[in-house]
Amino acid sequence: MTVCVAQAERGASELESKAMVKKSNDAALLVAHRIAEVVRSKPNCVLGLATGSTPIPVYQELARLHREEGLDFSQVRTFNLDEYAGLPPTHDQSYRFFMEEHLFSKVNIKPENVHFLSGLAIRAEDECIRYENALQTIGPCDVWLLGIGHNGHIAFNEPGSPRDSRTRVVCLTQSTIDANARFFGNDKSKVPTKALSVGIATIMESREILLLATGESKCEAVTKAIVGEPTNAVPASLLQRHPRCCFYVDEAAGAEVAETVTE
């Protein structure tokens, strides 16, 4: 596992860093440019994509690269990590809506090449099986972009999720509901309590994993994921076992990691 810490006005740490940059947004740009490299080298690549506020700058940069430099998405296939149970794709907090708004409507990706979990599936368990089978048939993902939750979750794999988990229906923890309430007008009662999510084993099959974390609020989770022992109590820590996983974190999110490694 490699750690890329975006630092401001300080010497390089002893981390296995590939880049030292000054602005938080630069961590997102590094991720976007790595994804662009994969798209250029393998036009029909399979991308796993995340949602939430953290990857928005990544998608903005990918859209710019398409618009200004001709980055071609016409053969790219994509899978999203998860979806809220009960939300239609037209809901402004559904992850399909998010992807259309922030990336898919801005590049030349083909609708038949994008894959989502349906939050409205009558038989959610069957929908999860369908999605996992599609991933196994079309994938594995060449790159999977991840974020990290305050409690160390990846996708909606909450603490305690089995290492061998596959796409399934999950119950969200109260801490995740609390954290996501900001997207629902700060009304916790409007946040779905269940979701459909790819599993840890599914993510680990990706050829490459890029985890992006920014801001002080993610510092504790990042530290546990990178410095602590791999444990399903902190799902992101299990990524340490992946041969090609890179954490891209800004100075705020990576502060304790840098201090731990350089002591």
Curated annotation (Swiss-Prot):
<dbReference type="InterPro" id="IPR004547">
    <property type="entry name" value="Glucosamine6P_isomerase"/>
</dbReference>
<keyword id="KW-0378">Hydrolase</keyword>
<dbReference type="GO" id="GO:0004342">
    <property type="term" value="F:glucosamine-6-phosphate deaminase activity"/>
</dbReference>
<dbReference type="InterPro" id="IPR018321">
    <property type="entry name" value="Glucosamine6P_isomerase_CS"/>
</dbReference>
<dbReference type="GO" id="GO:0006046">
    <property type="term" value="P:N-acetylglucosamine catabolic process"/>
</dbReference>
<dbReference type="GO" id="GO:0006043">
    <property type="term" value="P:glucosamine catabolic process"/>
</dbReference>
<feature type="active site" description="For ring-opening step">
    <location>
        <position position="158"/>
    </location>
</feature>
<feature type="active site" description="For ring-opening step">
    <location>
        <position position="151"/>
    </location>
</feature>
<dbReference type="Pfam" id="PF01182">
    <property type="entry name" value="Glucosamine_iso"/>
</dbReference>
<comment type="subunit">
    <text>Homohexamer.</text>
</comment>
<keyword id="KW-0119">Carbohydrate metabolism</keyword>
<dbReference type="InterPro" id="IPR037171">
    <property type="entry name" value="NagB/RpiA_transferase-like"/>
</dbReference>
<comment type="similarity">
    <text>Belongs to the glucosamine/galactosamine-6-phosphate isomerase family.</text>
</comment>
<comment type="function">
    <text>Catalyzes the reversible conversion of alpha-D-glucosamine 6-phosphate (GlcN-6P) into beta-D-fructose 6-phosphate (Fru-6P) and ammonium ion, a regulatory reaction step in de novo uridine diphosphate-N-acetyl-alpha-D-glucosamine (UDP-GlcNAc) biosynthesis via hexosamine pathway.</text>
</comment>
<feature type="active site" description="Proton acceptor; for ring-opening step">
    <location>
        <position position="153"/>
    </location>
</feature>
<protein>
    <recommendedName>
        <fullName>Glucosamine-6-phosphate deaminase 2</fullName>
        <ecNumber>3.5.99.6</ecNumber>
    </recommendedName>
</protein>
<feature type="active site" description="Proton acceptor; for enolization step">
    <location>
        <position position="82"/>
    </location>
</feature>
<dbReference type="GO" id="GO:0005737">
    <property type="term" value="C:cytoplasm"/>
</dbReference>
<dbReference type="GO" id="GO:0005975">
    <property type="term" value="P:carbohydrate metabolic process"/>
</dbReference>
<dbReference type="InterPro" id="IPR006148">
    <property type="entry name" value="Glc/Gal-6P_isomerase"/>
</dbReference>
<dbReference type="GO" id="GO:0042802">
    <property type="term" value="F:identical protein binding"/>
</dbReference>
<dbReference type="GO" id="GO:0019262">
    <property type="term" value="P:N-acetylneuraminate catabolic process"/>
</dbReference>
